[in-house]
Design a protein with these regions (language model features):
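Solvent-exposed interaction patches of small proteins and small membrane subunits
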Residues: 1-109
Length: 109
């Protein structure tokens, strides 16, 4: 029974990471669309990194370092192999990434 409970908890935790990946994809693509609507140079063809940097430059995102860390973590999250890495990712999502998503949502309204 204890092993089953641990497995269920891990499934939920890995699901949180999967939802972060999806949310990040939607966020940077929404930012790209907003930048295109504002006529920002490079918005139409930019990579996620370029879009995030441009969004920071034009004050759509508050903290470029957090967004670039999100990009890095999104790219490496498929290679999380142990519980400590899952713990670290969950804490980053809770403490840094969710507030950044909320900030972008407020800015885009």
């Amino acid at each position: 029974m204890q092993i089953l409970k641990w497995q269920i908890i891990m499934i939920y935790r890995i699901g949180v990471i999967g939802q972060f990946n999806l949310t990040f994809e939607l966020a940077w693509k929404a930012l790209q669309e907003i930048l295109k609507m504002h006529g920002a140079d490079g918005a139409a063809t930019g990579s996620p990194r370029e879009i995030l940097q441009l969004g920071y430059k034009l004050s759509f995102v508050d903290d470029a370092a957090v967004w670039l860390l999100m990009l890095k973590k999104r790219n490496t999250s498929v290679h999380i192999y142990n519980e400590q890495e899952v713990d670290e990712m969950i804490l980053l999502i809770r403490d840094s990434f969710i507030p950044a998503f909320v900030g972008l949502e407020k800015t885009l309204r």
